Amino acid sequence: MSSKKNRKRQKEGAEGASPSLSAAPSRSGTSTPFAQPSPAAPGMLVVTNFLEKVDGKVPKTFQNSLVHLGLNTMKSANICIGRPVLLTSLDGKQEVYTAWPVAGFPGGKVGLSEMAQKNVGVRAGETIQVQPLLGAVLQAQEMDLALSDKDKEINEEELTGCILRKLDGKIVLPGNFLYCTFYGRLCKLQVLQVKGTDGTTLGKLQSASGTDAQGMASEHSSMESSDVDLSFQLSQLDLKEPQSPSSQSTPCKPTNDRTVNKAGEVLLDVTQSPRDGSGLGLEESTGLKCSFDSSKEGNTQPVSEEKLLKPASAGTKSNTDTFYFISSTTRINLRKICTNSKEQDSQFKVTYDMIGGLNSQLKAIREIIELPLKQPELFKSYGIPAPRGLLLYGPPGTGKTMIARAVANEVGAYVSVINGPEIISKFYGETEARLRQIFAEATLRHPSIIFIDELDALCPKREGAQSEVEKRVVASLLTLMDGIGSEGSEGRVLVLGATNRPQALDAALRRPGRFDKEIEIGIPNAQDRLDILQKLLRRVPHLLTKAELLRLANNAHGYVGADLKALCNEAGLHALRRVLRKQPNLPDSKVAGMVKITLNDFLQGMNDIRPSAMREVAIDVPNVSWSDIGGLENIKLKLKQAVEWPLKHPKSFNRMGIQPPKGVLLYGPPGCSKTMIAKALANESGLNFLAIKGPELMNKYVGESERAVREIFRKARAVAPSIIFFDELDALAVERGSSSGAGNVADRVLAQLLTEMDGIEQLKNVTVLAATNRPDRIDKALMRPGRIDRIIYVPLPDAATRREILNLQFHSMPISNEVDLDELVLQTDTYSGAEIIAVCKEAALLALEENIKADCIMKRHFTQALSIVTPRIPESLRRFYEDYQEKSGLHTV
């Protein structure tokens, strides 16, 4: 049978049908096939891009394993539909794919997907050899795969099962890449060695020499050594490197560096000698090895990822050789690759020293976590059950995940990370099985910590669950946490959870015995922000003094740790732009030494980086200062007392035993600068400013208006210290019983507003500032002390205030010397501030109307403007405010 096959191969080689069987003259006078195809060999096709959506009948999962060919091309190459074909590039890289016909596909071309082009090492327009597989295709009994270090946390048993399921029937060669989606994560593996059911082993022998320029492992050729005598092999072995493919000569198969290993037989490896690269080296080790001196046992040496995860370029297989495919009975051996990133990992390893502003929380966390893990016997001796779980909760960006990473690095325990959304599977029972396996592995490798990030996504409240999967996951996690310690690992396994929505967690999860302790990681205060900034700038070149850092920390109201880190990055970019603007052509080495961050860089960065909680309610604070408002000095003082003093002098308030005012109401006639005062307060105080217009909160759906009020106060607490400004409060806080709307929406909104301002939940570092011109319509419950402590009447401007308002306007307008300021002050009696500004604008327009090129405003223009703009607040309204003030006894200024 073998003689017939040999005669057939010689006949095909004589006809030039197969490039891999083409004869070449050798030193011994025998003919041997080429190791690599020549560009002019038969079967060479031009690579083109894969055609998408050609055949809807082909499942999407199989499309990446196909190559597209024209019908005529398949006929001429004797390729059958749906049969495997061997792709061989000019560099010797090989892959096996399935041939698939495409109607109208151009002749002489082959369509490859992007992944196939990458694996074989070709691009569109290059040539590649396509041959049908004529040799036997047997099952692979065993296969060694290289697993990247980045996938080291993956469970090997489950990954092996996933590979056998998804790659069943895949024909593999040493050096090929395999891609497998594991729980939504794409894993890339490389075939190191394949052992068939016939005992033949195809493998890759790794070079341990660091001087290899390519840094790649050699592939071993496949040869039938069962019928070949060792002495015959040695007598025919050529120890000189062939000069060209045409002069290559060996008595074995042409692929010079693949190994064949049959059980109980001699191992023969042929590679280049590391000494001079001009010959072949021999080494004897329990048989005969021809390999590098340093590569004794390729599998016992840690192999770098750069050397493994590259396709082999040397050595090819003939299409008449024996090939092996993956089956359900194939045994998979996963070998992890050591990477060179250990130094980088240690450089960026998170430690306790890198966390700022959380000293008290870190102390409590270390007591809860480190003591049970390091001294479990101490708890047993006193009969104290060790805590099983610790829950960290707080707003996003405060450092919950960073604390967990620091704990994992500092404690030295085995850490298993569960990202809630990642392990959720659509298949029944798969999510619970994954959870059980993680807990079982942590128990075996104790002391260990199981960190569950975004716990609310994994364990929401069961009564509000969208599907049965969520309920089963919650029940499974409850059972697993109750079972911690049942195998004798009491106190040696701890679950650390993190969430920013603790109210969304299932109540059963938060009871003692599961998550025993809950620690809030809140928004940092000024002192904590200073600590965070100092640790962030520890390794950053800057010119900030301690006083400037303190000022920066005091101004960064509502910034969390993530915001401060983003602020430092933005300040660094500002500093870099400043240097490059002056000297744009500087080399990188000189720029690095010149860039130093200043306080001005941080102040500019704060204009771009706002607190995270303020981004959804971002408001451009108007550039209005106290100096832009004429007069009203007493009102300015009262507002500073209510807003700025509690922040700048908190010890004075504590010493006096008083609480800062919670609310300030400004009321008075329209146009008397009530809203402008609020703008100036927002700008001058530097606090986070939330401007709310009363009618915007009203919603026709039941409960939505109250929810909007509740959400406003929640955001204000999150970015405290902050100011909530309610303009036109009379539209929102209407006196109860006066509303005629359906469902009494106004009454419910008012009740929610009263509860938020002075309810069970304390309103800390949040000041409510309101403005209205109808104080008589506001409910009396809102006007009492404890809710609105300061009620300030803003009357029409007096003579001194009108003088300041006119002076401010004259600074920006060209006024003629004939204009008498005192006379204007007298003429604008009973005018509001807005009407005085309107008089000035009208006079300017009259001057332009008279002469478009006018360069100043004359007295006659003001006289005419005063006749056009008249006081619009009647005497009755002024008397109303005065009577209301006297009857209600409200505090006035």
Curated annotation (Swiss-Prot):
Compositionally skewed regions (Polar residues) per UniProt: 202-212, 243-253
GO CC term, one of those recorded: mitochondrion
Q: Which residues form a coiled coil?
A: none
Enumerate the Pfam families for this protein: AAA, AAA_lid_3
Describe regulators of its activity: AFG2A alone display limited ATPase activity and is not regulated by RNA or DNA binding. In the context of 55LCC heterohexameric ATPase complex, the ATPase activity increases and is stimulated by DNA binding and inhibited in presence of RNA.
**Residues annotated with Phosphothreonine modification:** T271
In which residue ranges is the amino acid composition biased (Low complexity)?
15-26
Q: Which residues bind ATP 1?
A: G394, P395, P396, G397, T398, G399, K400, T401
Q: What is its EC number?
A: 3.6.4.10
| InterPro entries assigned to the protein according to its UniProt record, in alphabetical order | AAA+_ATPase, AAA_ATPase_domain, AAA_lid_3, Asp_de-COase-like_dom_sf, ATPase_AAA_core, ATPase_AAA_CS, P-loop_NTPase
Instruction: Give the GO molecular function terms.
Output: ATP binding; ATP hydrolysis activity; preribosome binding
- Per the similarity annotation, which family is this? Belongs to the AAA ATPase family. AFG2 subfamily.
The domain comment in this protein's record states:
The first ATP-binding region binds ATP with low affinity whereas the second ATP-binding region binds ATP with high affinity.
Q: What is this protein called?
A: ATPase family gene 2 protein homolog A
Provenance organism: Mus musculus
